[in-house]
Amino acid sequence: MVKTVMIVGGQRKNLPFFWLAEFPGTERGKMYCQINAGGLYGLQSYVAQVEVDISKGLPCFDMVGLLDSEVREARERLRVSLHHINAALPAEKITVNYSPAGIVKSGTSFDLPTALVILAAQGKVPPERLKELWAVGEVGLDARIKQVRGVLAMLHAANQSAFRSYLIPFENLGEGIAAGKLPVMGVCSLEEAMEYVNASAQEQERMRRDAEDRWQSQTKGGMEKEKKAPDFALLCGMEEAKRAAMIAAAGAHNLLLAGPPGTGKTMLARCLPGILPPMSEEEKQEVSAIYSAAGQLEDGRLIQERPFVSPHHTASVYAMTGGGAVPKPGMVTLAHRGVLFLDEMTEFKRQTLDVLRQPMEEGKIFLARSRGNFVYPADFMLLGATNPCPCGYYPDRNRCRCQDWEVHRYLARLSGPLLDRMDLCCQIKQTPIRKLWEKREASYIDSDKNGSKWMREQVLEARKRQQMRCRGAAMRENGRLSPGEILKYCPLGLEEQEFLEQASEQAGLSMRGCHRVIRVARTIADLEGKDRIGVEHLGQALFFRNQNVLRE
């Protein structure tokens, strides 16, 4: 064995050559290597570093860095997978460190970077190339690279560091393409990852193109046709409800529908996405990153349509807001930039409904958990549908068999503060049967002013007016205007002020209620192409503000 002489504690000692790596100030040689990786902490993505040190000593495999069980279990997965590619772990002391050490590492995305950094320390791949490489992916026992969640969100964070290349699972390649013009390579196996790292720059570029073409060809046949919302023209009658839906879509207002069973409340809600304005590219990236972190991004493609989330009435508080020590996105976050539809709203538990009050007001949800405090986006439009009583036919006493106390208890699940945040309330009554026999041809649907095509055009025009009004500032829908912005963008004349004062005294409106009436009136004026809010606009807003529709 090669030995060297070193002064230790004033004494001359003959030491094995490889012990030099254990003393401060000496070079570690090729037994140390580092690679970049990505992780998720709730919805927040971050760039991590994976370091490995292989030194002489009793054979062991230590992993440090505040790791969750999913990351620690990678030890056995990697032991078997590396053996499958004839790169078994050396019978030495292996220490893997994950930084930053102050963040809990969870998920299986650290498998691939850990495997690559061990291979580099063994000399299987060039260690210097890993310093500019970013990698995530789960490694199976057969050395295949499997899909992980949150790749799109992690790529957004990694893009700020401008790495030379990005290595992800082939199944996540759609998210890599959606992240922008990044040099992203999708690999199917650990051997393919090694081949990519060992290749030249020109060869790597060719491999990236081939992987993208292969992914496009595989997903092209499986692409589903775009799901279209039902057309509003298919709804018979319901002019007031259609008007309320158009106002809600134009200004991002909350809407409550009440009426007997079978009157079309749910059908109207399903039609609403068909008249909503399209998302901007920034909103598509934002919403897609949320769904990627939740593991619900289909085919890794950017979400094109606004989310429409409809939880079951048995959903718990944690399902609505997000559950877990590091909470996953709940229903309110999945509905971000879209619609949260609560069918049979009075069947939800009251505490489940009351947690909606904060995100309805602020557009985000604050969660306090054992591992920290989290703030998730939750800017949605709430759409509720409910029956007026347990049987659904109140106040028709010919059909309703509910006692007064039963009706009161049933409606009491909708608290006053929650109802005060509903901008629009609309009662839907039974439609006469003769409406069903009216002619419904395709040409009629296209030309009908109550059809989705015409309504969508009106909504887009109203949104353009809002955008022009907020020119030079961040675009905000009328339903999201702050009190200061209401004074700036929604001025009232003397006649309108007197009208609103009298109406608010008669209806007992709160200050928040008055603000919401002004917001709705501003949207109605935008739909009619008016620059100023008139008395007629305030009157229509007050008509839809009537919250006694549940008891009429």
For the regions a language model picked out, list residue spans one by one.
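Peripheral, non-AAA+ core regions of ATP-driven protein-machinery
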Residues: 2-9, 14-18, 22-256, 260, ...
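Basic, amphipathic alpha-helical bundle interface domains used for macromolecular binding and assembly
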Residues: 67-75, 90, 97-107, 326-327, ...
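Walker A/P-loop
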Residues: 257-296
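Inter-Walker segment of RecA-like/P-loop motor cores
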Residues: 302-311, 318-319
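Conserved alpha-helical scaffold flanking the Walker A/P-loop in AAA+ ATPase domains
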Residues: 318-339
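Walker B catalytic acidic pair
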Residues: 343-344
